[in-house]
């Protein structure tokens, strides 16, 4: 049996990208939620190369009197999950909570995650109730969740919700992983001994627009498929075997029909032959594209470039800046 250690300090990690409108409310509500815990806490806000005034606002928040905010400024935009990993490398708490900056996941849910983690869970996930997103976002999310569940075998209901709590040893384990394509919720579940999900509220986005465009969602799907499992390669081999057997069977059938009905019948089956040919060609291109994705990610990992570069870390005035 593993001993259950109570949470002593909470670190809240929030990636920020062009969120100047929501930042004041985000900081106020998150601070209030953390103060209600009656524990030590820190709020780490990571500016992911914002082009608006977000970085300046984060610096001011860290330098305010009695601030608990640590601002981490990246030199450019690296993506949500890389920004969160940058925050993980600077946390000091024994429970780390991730939260989006758009306030669709209410910071007021933080005490519930802490209470559940105190029961001994390594990872506390969340499932959004009554999602206030567009039909396209909800449909894409359902497809991605099903894809993840089938390829990884991890039965979690809502991988897209970033409001989650991780014990410190889970975060330390993730920091030892050096692959460039990272999806934090799944990576955490690989190391978790005990994980659970709880329902949380989901609000409409009050400020700005979602930073996930259609193409970024497509890239995310490829990241999920190629960086976490080799199942698609095995499925590709199975599909190739089925197509090969099907093609051989059709060839035998065509020979039998030609011998039975004569060469005149074969001329009338030209379009069928073209259809079969195009099917094979399409399957080959799909396979080549998938293999290319894997090879591209291998190439990226072999280069071993850092997944992010921290330009500056601003801690509260009582602590030294880095």
From Swiss-Prot:
Q: Provide Periplasmic-side residue ranges.
A: 257-269
Any GO MF annotation of the entry: phosphotransferase activity, for other substituted phosphate groups
UniProt KW Nucleus keyword: no
Bilayer topology reads: Multi-pass membrane protein
Bilayer-spanning residue ranges: 236-256, 270-290
Top-rank taxon, per record: Bacteria
Q: Sorted alphabetically, which InterPro entries does this protein's record hold?
A: ArnC_tfrase, Glyco_trans_2-like, Glycosyltransferase_2, Nucleotide-diphossugar_trans
Q: Name the Enzyme Commission number(s) assigned to this protein.
A: 2.4.2.53
Where is this protein found?
Answer: Cell inner membrane
Q: Which reaction does it catalyse?
A: UDP-4-deoxy-4-formamido-beta-L-arabinose + di-trans,octa-cis-undecaprenyl phosphate = 4-deoxy-4-formamido-alpha-L-arabinopyranosyl di-trans,octa-cis-undecaprenyl phosphate + UDP
Keyword set includes Metal-binding: no
Enzyme class label: transferase
Q: Which UniProt keywords apply?
A: Antibiotic resistance, Cell inner membrane, Cell membrane, Glycosyltransferase, Lipid A biosynthesis, Lipid biosynthesis, Lipid metabolism, Lipopolysaccharide biosynthesis, Membrane, Transferase, Transmembrane, Transmembrane helix
GO annotations of cellular component type: plasma membrane
**Where are the Cytoplasmic topological domains?**
1-235, 291-322
Q: Which GO terms describe its biological process?
A: 4-amino-4-deoxy-alpha-L-arabinopyranosyl undecaprenyl phosphate biosynthetic process; lipid A biosynthetic process; lipopolysaccharide biosynthetic process; response to antibiotic
Task: Give the record's pathway.
Answer: Glycolipid biosynthesis; 4-amino-4-deoxy-alpha-L-arabinose undecaprenyl phosphate biosynthesis; 4-amino-4-deoxy-alpha-L-arabinose undecaprenyl phosphate from UDP-4-deoxy-4-formamido-beta-L-arabinose and undecaprenyl phosphate: step 1/2; Bacterial outer membrane biogenesis; lipopolysaccharide biosynthesis
- What is known about what this protein does? Catalyzes the transfer of 4-deoxy-4-formamido-L-arabinose from UDP to undecaprenyl phosphate. The modified arabinose is attached to lipid A and is required for resistance to polymyxin and cationic antimicrobial peptides.
PANTHER family membership: UNDECAPRENYL-PHOSPHATE 4-DEOXY-4-FORMAMIDO-L-ARABINOSE TRANSFERASE, UNDECAPRENYL-PHOSPHATE 4-DEOXY-4-FORMAMIDO-L-ARABINOSE TRANSFERASE-RELATED
For this protein, the record's HAMAP family field holds: ArnC_transfer
Q: Which family does it belong to?
A: Belongs to the glycosyltransferase 2 family.
UniProt name for this protein: Undecaprenyl-phosphate 4-deoxy-4-formamido-L-arabinose transferase
Lineage per the UniProt record: Bacteria, Pseudomonadati, Pseudomonadota, Gammaproteobacteria, Enterobacterales
């Amino acid at each position: 049996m593993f001993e259950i250690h109570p949470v002593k300090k909470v670190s809240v990690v929030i990636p920020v990208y062009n969120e100047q409108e929501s930042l004041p409310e985000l900081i106020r509500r998150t601070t209030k939620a953390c103060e209600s815990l009656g524990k030590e806490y820190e709020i780490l806000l990571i500016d992911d190369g914002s082009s608006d005034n977000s970085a300046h606002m984060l610096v001011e928040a860290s330098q305010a009197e009695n601030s608990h905010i640590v601002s981490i400024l990246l030199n450019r935009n690296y993506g949500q999950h890389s920004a969160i990993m940058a925050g993980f490398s600077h946390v000091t708490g024994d429970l780390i909570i991730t939260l989006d900056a758009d306030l669709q996941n209410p910071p007021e849910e933080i005490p519930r995650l802490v209470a559940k983690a105190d029961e001994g869970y390594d990872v506390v996930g969340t499932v959004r109730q009554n999602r206030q997103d567009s039909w396209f976002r909800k449909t894409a999310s359902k497809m991605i969740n099903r894809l993840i569940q089938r390829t990884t075998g991890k039965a979690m209901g809502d991988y897209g919700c970033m409001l989650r709590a991780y014990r410190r040893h889970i975060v330390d384990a993730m920091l030892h992983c050096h692959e460039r394509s990272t999806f934090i919720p799944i990576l955490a579940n690989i190391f978790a001994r005990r994980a659970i999900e709880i329902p949380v509220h989901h609000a409409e986005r009050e400020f700005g627009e979602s930073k996930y465009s259609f193409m970024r969602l497509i890239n995310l799907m490829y990241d999920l498929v190629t960086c976490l499992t080799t199942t698609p390669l095995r499925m590709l081999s199975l599909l190739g075997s089925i197509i090969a057997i099907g093609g051989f069977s059709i060839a035998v059938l065509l020979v039998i029909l030609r011998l039975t009905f004569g060469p005149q019948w074969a001329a009338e089956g030209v379009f069928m032959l073209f259809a079969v040919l195009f099917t094979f060609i399409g399957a080959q291109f799909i396979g080549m594209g998938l293999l290319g994705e894997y090879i591209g990610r291998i190439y990226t990992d072999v280069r071993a470039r850092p997944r992010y570069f921290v330009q500056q870390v601003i801690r509260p005035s009582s602590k030294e800046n880095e």
